[in-house]
A protein has these predicted regions:
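Beta-loop-alpha module in the N-terminal Rossmann-like domain of NAD(P)-dependent dehydrogenases
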Residues: 176-236
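Nucleotidyltransferase catalytic core that binds NTPs
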Residues: 1-131
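N-terminal Rossmann-fold NAD(P) dinucleotide-binding loop
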Residues: 18, 143-146, 205
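C-terminal helix-rich "cap/oligomerization" subdomain common to oxidoreductases
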Residues: 187, 195-198, 341, 409-445
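N-terminal Rossmann-like dinucleotide-binding module
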Residues: 130-176, 445
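Rossmann-fold dehydrogenase core element
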Residues: 234-251, 272-276
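Contiguous beta-strand/loop segments that form the cofactor/metal-binding neighborhood of enzyme cores
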Residues: 301-302, 307-378, 408-416
Length: 445
């Protein structure tokens, strides 16, 4: 009778240690199944520095002639499910996990195998890749959060900061133990770093991005990148010309659970998706933000988040209608209705002068998904159907406030030499931003 063995791992930069462990696992039986962790699952459990894509790691394992089957591991409960699904006789794992998987003895026999000393993916990454050096542009709340979260991503290092006020810059660098600080942007960009994170006033984004790209820096910038279509097109054209990465800081797009949600929806479980509804409200005034910030309005400040969810699921919009409420010359709320392919509808509600439950619903012909508030910090989502017994829930780890997943994506893309994220493509960024552009054009007309 065939004896089935299963094991799991990331297998980043496949090395002799991996090979030895896999061969030891195969020696325990006849049929070896290898589970390769998805990039999103790795990030959900704090593994933020994986250098190879999921596809590259799977391909490396598939080339091994002694491996009989390769599967993708996407969530923490999958191991127990796989033991039953594949009729596994032995679950094999490295002895650095001794005791961690004893609970699986309920389903199969667990075998802890000796690992090869002196070799690891971490060591290989340190040898092959240099740490991404980054400069921060802006000293506001976002900058402080970014600096804290970047400490959890091992392949990036903040080494410089720019601000308009030199006294504030010097105070910030001293408190944060950052080597370089400057109040002259052009001089700042001459410093030896690879990339910038921009969190300045919205009206300064375009100029700060353009100047950074011209200085051959990769750019991660708070949203929106620009309020005009021509400006945005110009920035992406410049990034392409300079062969530099330009990415908008929509952190939801890089959260493990958010990406798993999109993959689940692509399987067609809900049937044809007819409507996506999402809300995002934030009372900036009550939180003590300056008027110069929140007077940009709810649409410019918040709409890109609901638009992200709608665009990722329904694609590019065909028509857009705005229903805003304005006070003191800016919109305190806006209900935005978009139409899409096959008559699907997107409903986005944003507000800075009203409070609303920040949840999201994705409605299909066979069922719906409910994402509880705050949906943009996606941790949990529920699939629900007419038959309530068929309902199920996904729960993912979500560490910090989500910035570390975005930072990990940004730094990994730079190290790989990739100029576009598959989690948030250039076309998607332009489609999302286009809704804001249309609103501002309508206000001016």
């Amino acid at each position: 009778m065939k004896k089935t063995i299963i094991t799991y791992g990331t297998y980043d930069m496949l090395h002799i240690g991996h090979l030895n462990l896999l061969k030891r696992a195969k020696a325990l039986g006849d049929y070896l199944i290898v589970g390769v962790t998805s990039e999103d699952y790795d990030r959900s459990r704090g593994k933020l520095n994986v250098s190879q894509s999921t596809e590259q790691r799977i391909e490396a394992i598939e080339k091994l002639d002694f491996v009989d089957e390769v599967i993708l591991e996407t969530h923490k409960n999958q191991k127990a499910e796989d033991m039953v699904k594949y009729g596994v006789d032995i679950f094999a794992i490295g002895d650095d996990w001794v005791g961690a998987f004893d609970y699986l003895n309920e389903f199969t026999h667990v075998e802890y195998l000796a690992r090869t000393e002196g070799i690891s993916s971490t060591l290989l990454r340190e040898e092959k890749f240099t740490t991404v050096k980054l400069g921060m542009v802006g000293l506001g709340r976002d900058a402080n959060r970014f600096l804290k979260e970047s400490g959890f991503v091992s392949n990036i290092e903040v080494g410089a900061v720019f601000g308009d006020n030199l006294d504030e810059v010097e105070k910030f660098t001293a408190l944060s133990n950052i080597e370089h600080g400057s109040s002259n942007y052009k001089e700042f960009l001459k410093l030896p770093f690879d990339a910038v994170y921009i969190s300045t006033s919205l009206e300064l984004h375009v100029e700060h991005i353009r100047t950074a790209l011209e200085a051959n820096k990769h750019v991660l910038c708070e949203n929106p990148l620009a309020l005009g279509k021509e400006e945005l097109n110009g920035l992406f054209s410049l990034a392409k010309k300079r062969k530099r990465l330009l990415l908008v800081a929509l952190k939801s797009a890089f959260a493990p659970a958010f990406n798993q949600l999109i993959k689940e929806l692509e399987q067609g479980t809900l049937g044809e998706i007819k409507e996506v509804r999402a809300s995002f409200t934030k009372l900036y005034k009550e939180k003590g933000y300056k008027k110069s910030f929140y007077e940009h309005g709810a649409t410019n400040l918040l709409l890109n988040y609901p638009s992200l969810l709608i665009q990722k699921i329904l694609g590019k919009s065909k028509s857009t209608a705005f229903f805003d409420q304005c006070e003191d010359g800016y919109d305190i709320s806006n209900r935005v209705i978009t139409t899409h392919k096959n008559g699907a509808i997107g409903l986005a509600t944003v507000g800075i002068g009203m409070k609303l439950e920040g949840d999201a619903v994705i409605a299909g012909t066979k069922g719906y998904v409910y994402i509880p508030a705050p949906w943009w910090l996606t941790k949990t989502f529920h699939f629900r159907f007419e038959d309530t017994e068929k309902a199920y829930t996904f729960n993912y780890e979500f560490q910090g406030d989500g910035l570390r997943y975005m930072i990990a994506e940004f730094s990994s893309l730079i190290q790989r030499g990739e100029l576009e994220s598959q989690r948030l493509t250039v076309d998607e960024m332009m489609d999302i931003n286009d809704v804001i552009v249309k609103y501002n054009e309508q206000k001016r007309s």
